[in-house]
A protein has these predicted regions:
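C-terminal regulatory/interaction module of P-loop NTP-utilizing enzymes
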Residues: 1-139
């Protein structure tokens, strides 16, 4: 229903609406949704891609990235995310950040250079970069 025009629109058969919202404490200037509004949605928790899926996505998006480099970067992402889940780190690593890092691989940077200059710079709280660096060295 459009309040301004007074026109009611009916949705077509088999039409569904999907919404995404970054409403948690980790997002700047976000607020909790009104409970009545939030109740209108079914919540779905999405997991990160598996390392194999994430490596495949990197190679699909950036065809010049070698499979071994994509696999290494995906494993590093898995370790850093796992550390965030265990509260050893306060910041996770998004798929977007991993893809951004993979773009540098395609430009000829090594995995180590990308990790040092792109990934580890996400960890700015005292001591977190050391924790992240120690995890990355395991790969």
């Amino acid at each position: 229903y459009d309040e301004d025009s007074g026109v009611r629109y009916n949705k077509g058969t088999n039409v569904q609406f999907v919404a995404a919202g970054n409403t948690g404490f980790a997002y700047v200037s976000t607020q909790r949704l009104d409970s009545a509004f939030e109740d209108r949605f079914i919540k779905v928790q999405l997991d990160y891609l598996t390392p194999e899926e994430e490596a495949a996505l990197m190679m699909q998006r950036y065809p010049l990235v070698k499979a071994s480099a994509a696999a290494q970067l995906a494993e590093i992402a898995r370790l850093l995310r796992q550390a965030e889940q265990k509260e050893a780190l306060t910041v996770s690593l998004s798929t977007r950040q991993v893809l951004d890092a993979a773009a540098y691989l395609q430009l000829g940077y090594s995995v180590r250079e990308v990790v040092e200059e792109v990934i580890l710079t996400n960890y700015v709280i005292a001591g977190e970069q050391l924790v992240a660096r120690s995890l990355v060295q395991m790969v």
